[in-house]
UniProtKB/Swiss-Prot annotation:
It comes from Cerastes cerastes (Horned desert viper). It comes from the Eukaryota. Keywords: Cell adhesion, Cell adhesion impairing toxin, Disulfide bond, Secreted, Toxin. This is Disintegrin CC5. InterPro entries: Disintegrin_CS, Disintegrin_dom, Disintegrin_dom_sf. PROSITE patterns: DISINTEGRIN_1, DISINTEGRIN_2. Disulfide bonds join 7-30, 21-27, 26-51, 39-58. Residues 1-65 form the Disintegrin domain.
Length: 65
């Protein structure tokens, strides 16, 4: 494999030591985005979805307006 992801340990294919994540809507530059960062803008009667600061996933909001 010639082009390794900068966040990925090429042997384990997991985040390198000191890095939090490899990819995802709440991952940037190998780190989780801050809690409260919008990861999915509201549409229609839905509300924004926000990063938690502990995961690279974008959890669905639990509330509807």
């Amino acid at each position: 494999m010639n082009s390794a992801h900068p966040c990925c340990d090429p042997v384990t294919c997991k985040p390198k030591r000191g890095e939090h994540c490899i990819s995802g809507p709440c991952c940037r530059n190998c780190k989780f985005l801050s809690p409260g960062t919008i990861c999915k803008k509201a549409r229609g009667d839905d509300m924004n979805d926000y990063c938690t600061g502990i995961s690279s996933d974008c959890p669905r909001n639990r509330y509807k307006s």
